[in-house]
Amino acid sequence: MAEMDLIHEQGAALPVAARSDVLVVGGGPAGQAAAIAARRMGVSVTLVERYPYLGGLASGGMVLVLDDMTNGSEITVTGICMEMIERMQRIDAAVYPPPEDRRQSEEMWRKWARWGVHDFRSTSKPLPIVMAAAFDPDGWKRIANDMITEAGVNLRLHSWFSKAIVDDGRIKGVICETKEGRQALFGDVVIDTSGDLDVAASAGAKFAEGGYMVTTVFRLGGVETETAERFRWGEPAAYAKRDKEAKSIIGGSWDMWWLKTPLPGVVWCNCPHMTGLDALKVADQTKADFEGRKRIYALVDYARANLPGFEKCFVVDVAPQLGVRQTRLLEGRYVVTKDDVNDRIWFADTVARGRDYYTPYRSLLPKDIEGLIVAGRHYSATESAQKLSREIPPCMSMGQSAGVAAALAIDGGLSLASIDPRAICAHVREQGGDPGDSPSANATAPKMAAE
């Protein structure tokens, strides 16, 4: 890449848009959970988000299944995540299998497979049906707005994070770009839920850079899903051939390239996947968006001509946010490893959990920046560990615990590092969450690695 031309920007006084006890940067699932949890603890909270909606990759990225939240028959992610699911279900914006259907059988597989509510990490066939929820992205936005409003969070949308404000090793707030110009926002504790570790990186925290495929998720309307499923089960050989051809056109997808949604005739497609792109670079993001749409339109043409049930399909929308899975990863007080996840290591300072793995409090804390805690897919983990632990429910579990930790620091006048993880867990449980402080039967012996 050619060296960029440089200009020198003249400094200017900035208006202060907000001062609060806790400042949360990033209104995705982890940020929502963090803001709500902290506010429920009684502290003042400001939440800033660059888009005109809440939900991040859940809503704007249209990752429309909440999974990785069960350990066998045990539901391991509850709290604010489960509140979202249940409230969306009450307005017909979420669908999940009832307890009696959460089992392994050919009957349940045929009934639920196209909802994506199966244990995708299982090696047995058919894949077991588990507690997971398919949802509508606008349903998410609606319930998120309700919950943020009910909690009393000061929400500032259309605010694009630009720079951390740091003084003598302590973060004080952030600068955001807005239509009104640059604005400063201050918080006694700052929570980075940006997804790309934007705040922590700007503040000077140590991090690694990972990389994983990106996706331009889209939805199709006008699909006769029952006809499509009859073709799948009634003509397996013909289905397999055409499904393979469709996947070849899209150029990268999971086993099932389309799944049902709560909206009749509307399916969502978690594809096409594209590799070798850096989601922190504008040129690569632009390339992904253009290439993704090109593949989508080619797939639609093929589906109309060749796939029963898709004869009249059309593109409802392409996700406004690129599906980014991994960029910067914090190098915090503890770095979670792939073995930690695969071996189900339980930590003495566990404060959050996913399917059958556990998140230590230290993995949310930068080593060298005071007043800052992180939550979400950019937490302190190796690339390989993060790929196994980055789903939305565990990120919400991290967010809820980070919000509680921030509030405890404010109330006690304490540093984040000095907060007792047991106190965090106790308050998360009071809010209906499962912070993982009581390990499941298949967890591995306690671990408290050195910082």
Where are these regions (language model features)?
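Conserved N-terminal/central alpha/beta ligand/cofactor-binding core
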Residues: A2, V43-S44, E49-K163
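Core beta-strand elements of the Rossmann-like FAD/NAD(P) dinucleotide-binding domain
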Residues: A18-S20, E180-V189
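N-terminal Rossmann-like FAD-binding beta1-loop-alpha1 element of flavoenzymes
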Residues: V22-T46
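Short hydrophobic core segments
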Residues: V25, L185-G195
